[in-house]
Amino acid sequence: MAMNFGDHASGFRHNDVIRFINNEVLMDGSGPAFYVAFRSRPWNEVEDSLQAIVADSQVPRAIKRACTWSALALSVRVATRQREELLHHVRRLQRHAEERQATSWALTSQLQQLRLEHEVAATQLHLAQAALQQALNERDGLYGRLLQIERFPQAAPLAHEIMSGPQAEQNGAAACPLATEQQSDMVAMGTHANAQMPTPTDVLYVPGPLSPWAQGMQPPLPVPHPFPHPPPFPMKFPSLPPLPPAVVTGAEAAAVPLQMPPTEIHPPCPWPAVGFQEEMAPLWYQRSYIQEEDSKILQGSFPLGDSRSHSQGEGSERSQRMPLPGDSGCHNPLSESPQGTAPLGSSGCHSQEEGTEGPQGMDPLGNRERQNQKEGPKRARRMHTLVFRRSHKSEGPEGPQGTVPQGDSRSYSQEGCSDRAQEMATLVFIRRCKPEGPKRPQWTVPLGDSRSHIKEEGPEGPQRIVLQGDNRSYSQEGSPERAQGMATLVFSRSCKPEEGPERPQDTPLGDSRSHIKEEGPEGPQRIVLQGDNRSYSQEGSPERAQGMATLVFSRSCKPEEGPERPQDTPLGDSRSHIKEEGPEGPQRIVLQGDNRSYSQEGSRERAQGMATLVFSRSCKPEEGPERPQGTPLGDSRSHGVRESPKKWQPQRQKAKKPKVNKVSGSQQQEKPASFPVPVNWKCPWCKAINFSWRTACYKCKKACVPFESGGQTQ
């Protein structure tokens, strides 16, 4: 048989078909030889063999028929085999596709991971670039500073050439800092206090400890110039390397050549006393020029600060001049034995003092220009108490003092007095100020951006005081006896002046511009308090005037005064114009505010003025007999005129409120018989307190008029 029934490779699924084909093959007589011979051959070979048998004419028809049925069965078998091969190939392709798809998924996830890593790397790269740029910038800045520091010593010859000429012409002295081990030489020079030295060769310099902030900052190149008033240098930043001072003694000292210091920065520090006048010579980029004519012993020490000071001394005995740390320019011609000291601050001081024995002057903090002329036969002493002092107490029978404290002030003072003048100013944050002494006039120009021009002429002791603020004051005082002025400035706890007889005192405060002329044989007084004031005062009084002003934020103010001293206290932002004329006690006080006051005072004996300003806790004036007191409070502009003999009493007040003028520039004058005293009075029936301008009690409606300040009625 040609085909087997169980052979699935034959391509036939039905046995009947297989049986029929086998019978046909066997019936023709050819047998299964052709089917078996081409079972495993491809279809092409089967077809070629069948074509050869059919084409052969010698092969009987029955054999041709049997070979044809065998070829048909082989064709089905070949088709089945090819199908199986195709299925196998399809399965294999499917497996390959699945494998490729899995590979693509893996590559996709890997690609996403690579993208994330790329973004992180890019961010890190940007950060690294920013840090690198910052480091490069810092490197460039530090390199620039290093180059500046390296180039800085090259500027020393240029500065020397610029400064050597003016110093040689003016017999001045400027020096470079010495090493630390040479400080002992400077301190040792104090032993030669009373000896006259010609041109000194030792140069004084005391370097302070280097601050870390000063080391970090780069110093700018110095630009030296010989002008006397340079702009102030900021204290919060490291300044130019200082050109430290040198002590020059002798009537005609030769100029010391200028030398530039090393590249260190020397901040301000405490300095030892040098010389026979106990003067300190700190550092602060300064230039000093001193001209001395007809003087025996002169010592000039110029301290810290971008200051330029010019001092001329004329006299026969001893002159001394020392400006302390600050940006100051000072011109001081002295005669005989004056002593001048200009402490801390950016100030320009022009002082001329002429006397016969021994005046002393010292100009403290502030950018100010001051011209002071003192003419008198005896001794004048000027002393300055600097910032943050707790208390200041000046005592002495014959020691005039002059004080010009902190502030951007320009004051011009001429003082001509014969006995004693004492000037004292206790500056900011002072707890207490108490001047005592029988015959001590004072002259005080304290804190503030003030410009005051003062002329004091008289045989004994005039006084003129202009306190805090942008003040411009012009004062002429001519009085023969004694004047005392005391000013306790801002944030002072208490101010208690205790004064004996014949001590006039006046204290102007605030941002004021005052013009004062005081003329009289004994003791005029003029006070202009805080505020943007412009006051013009002329005072002619023969004997004594006393004025005391305790400024803003003071806890208490208690003046204690002798007899026959009138007192007047206007408070607030006021514009007052007061003329006081009388034979005994003139006084003129203009307190805080934008004041413009014009005062003329002519009185002969004693006047006392007390002003307790805004924000004071308590004000308790205690006065002896024959001392009237007036205290107008608030934001007021008061205008008053008083003319009185030794004592005066408040007049009967009308049922009218005192005129309060809120416009500047107006004036009010009253006769001596009609001077009002605004004092509250107490009703004798209902004990209610009424204002001074009321004629009837507001509570019980009963008419009564006060006659004195103690609250009694008539």
Swiss-Prot record:
Region Disordered, annotated ranges: 300-419, 431-675
GO molecular function: mRNA binding; zinc ion binding
Entries under InterPro entries matching the protein: TEX13A-D_N, TEX13A/C/D_Znf, TX13C/D_rpt, Znf_RanBP2
Keywords: Metal-binding, Zinc, Zinc-finger
Zinc finger (RanBP2-type) in chain: 677-706
TM ranges: none
Biased composition (Polar residues): 403-416
Protein name (database record): Testis-expressed protein 13D
Species for this entry: Homo sapiens (Human)
